[in-house]
Design a protein with these regions (language model features):
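Parallel beta-helix/beta-solenoid
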Residues: 37-39, 57-59, 75, 125, ...
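Bacterial Sec-dependent N-terminal signal peptides
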Residues: 1-22
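Short glycine/acidic-rich loop motifs that flank beta-strands on beta-rich extracellular proteins
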Residues: 70-74, 139-140, 171-177, 206-212, ...
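Acidic Gly/Asp/Thr-rich repetitive segments characteristic of extracellular carbohydrate-active
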Residues: 21-45, 103-131, 137
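Extracellular beta-strand-rich solenoid/capping regions of secreted or surface-exposed proteins
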Residues: 49-61, 69-87, 118-125, 136-163, ...
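Short domain-boundary/entry signatures in modular proteins, especially
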Residues: 94-105
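Leucine-rich solenoid repeat scaffolds
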Residues: 69-92, 403-438
Length: 438
């Protein structure tokens, strides 16, 4: 019988008894005779191995404190196995539709590495709650598929919810990504799905004020081929590349599109780059049906990088379609393109059905940049009811491509632009009205 390490702390608390008996193991404990008392707490301080499947009594609490069990446990006809070491902070979750509370070896002290155990938790649990504490991430996730940069944490299965209590911080120091959520390449119909990240704080200890090209692709949260994902009420403090990147596998015309991000909501997040020594706040390189709303983005983007929100596919193999950017507050975006940019490059990268509405942009290098180089690669772009302060240059249009069906209405600018509207872009179907210069 193939055995997997069960080194997780499993507190299965379906009913709390008024009195809890605590039973501790010894180096010679026979597990077949150890678990007999319903409602008891069992302390596992020594390593054990058994070829017998152990059935747990009801309402027990297992606390692994340096010990482990190599074997299989069964509770309420549900088999529990895994490979997590333990002791430390509480995390709750579900496993095969059974609800439990667990104490894992997550030190949450900001000094000792928690990445290995968090990866193991996410391999087992569908719902994970991080209590208040600083979870230092040093070790790396080992992905089954090649991704462009190393990440500390990886998720490559569906139906995962991560929730952070106030003060729950995932902290990194190394030039690596924090969290990558990714599907198997070349299998878009079976992409992983239904991922929620809520209330977490992501902090990168980036002390640099000099731009290092390597860090451009070290994103805090990266999605590669994810369907139905929500990231909300999170805080991103400092970051190397992007705070959030809707990413890809480096696809091109020869490989075809190997992964696509679909039905993504990024809402009510606080994104602060601190020293403007990062790439973008949010990048959409590959995305379909994406909503970015009510986020606050400040101090994002090195002067050589695009800006706070960048919609920019790299190749015509990607999909960028039905993107809604609305009611965001952007301040001190110092990227070369603008606070919000839509780029369709010489390779014919697509940008279709994009709505940029009701955003407020202040103290930034530029509000908007639209770059259309290839005929009809970009179409149906709406820029409506945005407000731009006097410290921010309004726009740049660039490129020589033909583009269709633009609406530019109801925007308020407190400063003139020195750029000719549209530059050399050739519009086929443009509505330009009710824009105000105060």
């Amino acid at each position: 019988m193939l055995q997997r390490f069960l080194s997780l702390i499993l507190c299965i608390l379906l009913a709390c008894p008024s009195y809890t008996q605590t039973i501790q193991d010894t180096p010679n404990t026979d597990l077949r005779r150890f678990f007999t008392q319903a409602g008891a707490t069992y302390l596992i301080k020594y390593p054990h191995q058994t070829g017998t499947t152990i059935t747990l009594p009801p309402n027990v609490t297992l606390q692994f404190q340096g010990g482990s069990i190599a074997g299989k446990l069964v509770f309420n006809n549900t088999q529990l196995n895994g490979n997590v070491k333990l002791q430390g902070s509480s995390i709750s979750g579900t496993l095969k539709n059974k609800t439990f509370n667990a104490k894992w070896l997550c030190y949450a002290d900001g000094k000792k590495d928690d990445a290995t155990n968090i990866n193991a938790i996410l391999a087992m649990c569908n719902e994970v709650l991080f209590p208040k504490g600083t979870y230092l991430l040093e070790s790396m996730h080992k992905p089954p598929y090649k991704i462009n940069k190393p990440y500390h944490i990886g998720i490559h299965r569906s139906n995962i919810k991560i929730t952070g209590e106030k003060g729950a911080i995932l902290k990194t120091k190394t030039k690596a990504g924090t969290l990558c959520i990714y599907s198997k390449p070349k299998d878009i119909p079976h992409s992983i799905h239904d991922i929620t990240i809520e209330g977490m704080t992501f902090m990168v200890q980036n002390e640099s004020t000099e731009w290092d090209p390597y860090q451009e692709h070290c994103h805090t949260v990266s999605l590669i081929g994810v369907n139905r994902c929500t990231i909300e009420k999170c805080t991103f403090r400092n970051f190397w590349g992007d705070a959030i990147c809707l990413n890809h596998y480096g696809d091109n015309t020869s490989t075809g599109e190997r992964a696509r991000n679909m039905n993504v909501v990024i809402r009510n997040n606080q994104i602060n780059g601190y020293k403007c020594c990062n790439r973008n706040g949010i990048s959409i390189i590959n995305g379909q049906n994406v909503i970015i709303e009510k986020n606050q983005l400040t101090h994002t983007s090195h002067s050589s990088m695009p800006g706070a929100i960048d919609i920019e596919a790299n190749d015509k193999a990607y999909t960028v379609d039905n993107i809604q950017i609305r009611e965001n507050r952007i301040d001190h975006s110092q990227g070369k393109n603008g606070a919000i940019s839509v780029i369709s490059n010489k390779e014919g990268a697509p940008a279709h059905h994009i709505e940029i509405t009701n955003n407020k942009i202040t103290n930034s290098r530029r509000a908007f940049r639209f770059y259309v180089w290839t005929d009809y690669a970009a179409s149906h772009i709406t820029v409506k009811d945005n407000w731009v302060d006097k410290n921010t240059d309004p726009w740049v249009w660039d490129g020589k491509g033909r583009t269709q069906n633009w609406v530019f209405t109801g925007n308020t600018f407190l400063r003139k632009t020195n750029k000719k509207f549209g530059q050399d872009v050739r519009f086929e179907g443009l509505t330009y009205k009710n824009n105000r210069l105060k």
